[in-house]
Amino acid sequence: VPCQIFQDDTKTLIKTIVTRINDISHTSVSAKQSVTGLDFIPGLHPILSLSKMDQTLAVYQQVLTSLPSQNVLQIANDLENLRDLLHLLAFSKSCSLPQTSGLHKPESLDGVLEALLYSTEVVALSRLQGSLQDILQQLDISPEC
């Protein structure tokens, strides 16, 4: 299967996830907003390789699955599918991505979730949206492993 198919499917899923995030009304917060205790959520920085994309998405997936909000369940599932597509894309380019499914849960996550549920969701979704836009741009220039 040509890697272009995986790349196209990946782009389509990213656009779907961005649309889902836009449909959740409270995401009009800046991705650059700083909220004390949420520094474990990846910020906006260039994501240049497939392995870095996967690592970043794994953190977002972990954060979103830890939130009790029904709004983010579908997005978390979409992230799992997106990571699977990235692995297929990497495989089609003869890359091997390290398994990141067993990520270490940030120590601060449980305490932060109790105290800042709403803020965590807003910041995570806002930053995820920015990261997805960045990944979409990187896919256009065919990222390295």
From Swiss-Prot:
One of its GO terms (cellular component) is extracellular space. The keyword RNA-binding does not apply. Disulfide bonds join C95-C145. GO terms for biological process: energy reserve metabolic process; lipid metabolic process; negative regulation of apoptotic process; negative regulation of appetite by leptin-mediated signaling pathway; phagocytosis; positive regulation of estradiol secretion; positive regulation of female gonad development; positive regulation of interleukin-12 production. The keyword Repeat does not apply. Keywords: Disulfide bond, Obesity, Secreted. Its main location: secreted. GO terms for molecular function: hormone activity; peptide hormone receptor binding. It is found in: Secreted. It comes from the Eukaryota. Key player in the regulation of energy balance and body weight control. Once released into the circulation, has central and peripheral effects by binding LEPR, found in many tissues, which results in the activation of several major signaling pathways. Belongs to the leptin family. This is Leptin. The gene is LEP.
